[in-house]
Every structure is written in structure tokens, then in C-alpha cells.
Amino acid sequence: MRRPKKYESGEATQYISRRAALRKLQLSLNDFRRLCILKGVYPREPKHRRRAQKGSSEIKVLYHTKDIRFLLHESIVWTLRDYKIFAKKSNRDRAIKDFRNLKRRLALFPEIKLDHIVKERYPTFIDALKDLDDCLTLLFLFSTFPSLHLIPREQSNLCRRLTIEFLHYVIASKSLRKVFISIKGYYFQAEIKGQKVTWIVPHYYPFKPQSRQEVDFKVMSIFVEFYTIMLGFTNFRLFHGLNLAYPPQFPSSVLQDSEESLKDEASFVSDRIAALNFELLRTDKVQEDEEELDIDMELLEQDGDSKRIIKMKQEAQEVSRLRTLFKGLKFFINREVPREPLVILIRSFGGKVSWDSSIFAGSTYDEGDETITHQIVDRPSITTQYISRDYIQPQWVFDCVNQRQLLPTNKYFIGETLPPHLSPFVDSKRDSYIPPEEKALLDPSLIETHAQSDDDSEDEAQEEEETVDQELLDAQLQLAYQQETAEYKKYGGPDGVNEDEEDPDDEDDNEDDDEEEEELDEKTKRLQEEKQKMSVQSGKVHKVNKRQVHKAEVDEHRLQARMVKPRHRNLFRKLIREKQTKEKEEWLLRKKRRTIEANEKEARKTAKREARKEAAAAAAKASKLGK
């Protein structure tokens, strides 16, 4: 029997170094990286590095041996080898100035086909939707780039086209659920086929070239190469699920015989598609209504799942109301406001939107239209204003979507200090610090109704002043009443007779009252004796000692810490440290909040004091002038 040698089995055979993988695949490092990105193969961290590296203590990049064997049978490997052959032959033709042969070779440039890799990595459509977050974020980022050294113009244009198509699907399906504005950009979350897809759209700033190569655009462009194929398949499937024509097309009513459409119909259509302001052509002639979440009412009769199904029904009703949140409202976007994010929001929830035709193609009505209900402005003042519309800041649209209702517009008028813009991606039931502004937004009873305006706030201020005056008047009346009663007791009643001197008629009445009370006491005693057998004694209030309860919890926690297994102690300590840091952060936030509130209170007091001093000085000055 042969004695087994060391490192011939176990963890040593499960991993392979990157250098050995390059020798096995006969590829360069750049081609190997490209192949790993396209196939979704990434380095692994072994449990025991020394065993995996066959006794070597050097830090190496390791891969699973099974993954490298999997790459051996990939057809892309042959295409990458063809790239090397093509480069050598084209350089030779260029050196000998054989341009005819070079032109022929360029026409036969080898192309990588990634269709089979997409099907291989995502066997089902739901798997592709689950991995759509990073895909959309990266493609939206590359769609804003100009032509760079490693990013050709065709790639950025393709990213722009695919992302616009996806936004058209979101608008047509009304699947948008949450939005948020941050420093990074605009966060969007849509619910597609039961899967929550979240992506970021960057802010629209002018491109600033890098002074140093801090970002490897070559690696990122390889990811984009794969994600464009993936998103193309996804858009095709999503569009056909809604009976929309793919690629996107317009009905004949939009393509009227105008000068622009007759000159260049392709550019006319592409501009209108990028505007996101027109409905797309459907494959069926009759336009289908909006998809509604139908719930079988018979399921509510089941006793076991009644609570869960009722909760599902409530959520479905909220979503159906959210889909028509802006229905019947007409918006106009000023030129200083970002157009595309607001168009996505307003159209996804049933509203109509337009802008100045000089900004971008696709506007449907101008600023002078009197049926406009809201005009979105992001400047301190505006010259001409219409009485029939509300002039609001862009945050109102985002907050309405997150709160799933139309908020009052008085807090979002031009020049107003905006309320805090809270993230909808934070769990409201979390065990951490929640600011009072967020509590006020989460509690429906604290949110003002949509019909409230500045007139209501003025009425409230007048009511507060009246209540203050009424309180002062009540205090003066109470003081006068106390003085009057004191004098009444001191000097006697209205006839000059002291209250301590009693009338004989009153004594007879008191005796009759005593007899009636004795009879009632006897009746109550008899009833108590009859019900004595069935009597229920009242319970006593048990006072809880908070210090003892806290001590018992601490002792129990220490006992649990002792009972933790030795192999789990590091994990237990890590969890305890995370909990302590979380509690410390919460305590610091509460302390900071108390400090801010104390400073604000002190500032209000000083302002009131100064106002009183100014009023007193003005009154004294007026009295001097009167004299």
C-alpha cells in the first residue's frame, strides 16, 4: 500500500494560484482578468492559507481549481487567442505597408459573443432581475461619460439607449416605489416581478477629466461590455411582458408630418424617446389598462393566514393609490431644475409634465398654459407668477412619493426653508435613534392635511394670541375671586352673620339627613354580607424596582457570556462590540440633539427679551413725546 504524500489531497488540491492558472489556460494577465470578469470567477480566501499554498507562507491570489477547469472549456478562450494572432498579423501588414491586406483583416476582426454566458450565469429571468442593481448603476454612470481613451463613444451611446429603454418600462409599468436625493445622485427603487431593483442615477455635472489614473476604466469597461448584453436581454423580455414594441416605437399620432420628422425621422424619434414624455407603441391595437394587483377575496375567509393576507391587501391598496398619486396634475419644469429625474417621477405616478421647448425636445405645452397646477422652481424668486398654480421646490415631488400622499405645498414654496429630506430606505422599526422630524413624518396624525395654507397659519397665530389673552384674564378673575371669598369669610355673610353660627332649622335638617344615611349604611351592609361568598378582592399594585430588574438582566447576560462555546467567543465579542458602538452612537446623537434644542430655546428667549426691551423703550419714548 502506497503511503499518501503531503499536499496531494484535501485543501491543497482545492486551490490553485493565479500564476498556475495562467500557465494552464495559456493566457496573458489582461486576458485572464477579462475572462474572469465575464464568467463571474473571482479569487477565494482559504480557511488555512498555508495548507492551500502547499506549505508556502507567501500571500498569493488563489482560485478554486474547479473554476479554472470550468474556464478551460470556454469558447471565449479561443477568441482571446485569436486577438493575439490578429494583432501580430495586423502589425506585420502595417510594417510592410500592405494596407489592402490590413483593410481585409480589419473587416474580419474577431468578436466575442456573450449571449451564452448570460444564459449560463442567469438560468432564469428572476436571477437576472436580482443582479440588476449593479448593472443599472454602472450603465447610468457610463451613459454620462464623453468619449475617452478607454471608453469609446459607441459604448457610452449604447449605455444611454439601454437605460432610457429601461426607464420607459418603469414609467409604463408604474413600478417605481421609492426615491431619494443624496450627494452621490438620485436613488430609485422599482418593484419588478416581485423583485426590488435599486439603482443610482448620477447628478448632471460637467465631466472633469482625471489628473491621475485612480480609476481603472479598462476593467470597468469590461463589466459594461457584459452588462450591456444582459440589460438588452432584460429590456426585451420586460417590453414584451407589457405588449410594448421593442425597440421602442411611437404611434402614428406622434409622428406627424412636421418639418423635423420629414428631415430626419430617426433623430426625431430618438429625441422623443429620450424625452420620456410620450407613450410607446403597443403590439396590440387596444391599449391595455394599468396592471392592478388582484387579490382573491375568498382567501380572507381562511382563519390561519387572515392577518398576513389582510396585510398583503392593505399593501396592494397602498400601491394602487401610489400609482395614481399625480393623476390629474399638470407640472411645468423650469430650466434650472434637473429635467429627467422629475419626468420619471411624475410620469410614473400618472401626472403630466412639460418644460421649455428650448431646453430639450418633447415638450407638450408651454409655461403660459393656465391648466398647469404646479410649477417646479429652484430659484429664490420669479418675476411672473400665476394665481392658478403652486410654485414649489423639487423636493416636494420626492417627499410626496416617499410618503405616498400629496403633502401640503406651503412648506415647499419659493424661498421657504425646506423640511428634512429623509431616506425611505431606512427601516422605520429599527432599534436606533430616530430624529423627531422623521417621527413626525412617520406618524400620520402629525402630518398636516393638503388643504392647509398660509391663511390657516395666520389664523392659528391669532388664536394663540387670543388664548394667551384669555389665560391672563382668567388669572386676574381668579385672583379677584380669592380676595372676595377671603373677605367674605373674615367679615361674615351678606347679612353680617358669621358662618360659624348655625340656625336651629338647619340643625333639624341635618338630623333628618343623618337618619337617611344610617338607613343606607344598613342596606349596603346587608348586600355585602349576601355577596361575601362571591366577592372578589381588589389587587394590589406591584411596584417594580428598576435597579433590581437591571441587575438581574446584567447577571443573566454575564451567565450567557460564560456559557458561550470557546470557538464562538470571538464572534460573541464582535457582536457585543457592535452593539456597544451602536448604543454609543445613539447616545451621542441624542446628546447632540439636546444641545441643539437647548441652544435654540436660549436663542428664542433672548429674542423675546430683546423684543420686550425694544417695546418698552418704544413705549417710554412715546410717553415722553405725549408729555
From Swiss-Prot:
Family annotation (SUPFAM superfamilies): BRCT domain (SSF52113)
Gene Ontology, cellular component aspect: nucleolus; nucleoplasm; PeBoW complex; preribosome, large subunit precursor
UniProt xrefs under Gene3D superfamilies: BRCT domain
Stretches the record annotates as Disordered: 450-469, 488-566, 596-627
Keywords: Coiled coil, Nucleus, Phosphoprotein, Ribosome biogenesis, rRNA processing
CDD domains linked: BRCT_pescadillo_like
Biased composition range(s): Basic residues: 540-549
Localization (cell): Nucleus, Nucleolus; Nucleus, Nucleoplasm
Residues carrying Phosphoserine: 453, 457
GO BP terms in the entry: maturation of 5.8S rRNA from tricistronic rRNA transcript (SSU-rRNA, 5.8S rRNA, LSU-rRNA); maturation of LSU-rRNA from tricistronic rRNA transcript (SSU-rRNA, 5.8S rRNA, LSU-rRNA)
Disulfide links within the chain: none
Compositional bias segments (type: Acidic residues): 454-469, 497-521
Protein name: Pescadillo homolog
Organism encoding this protein: Drosophila melanogaster (Fruit fly)
Lineage: Eukaryota, Metazoa, Ecdysozoa, Arthropoda, Hexapoda
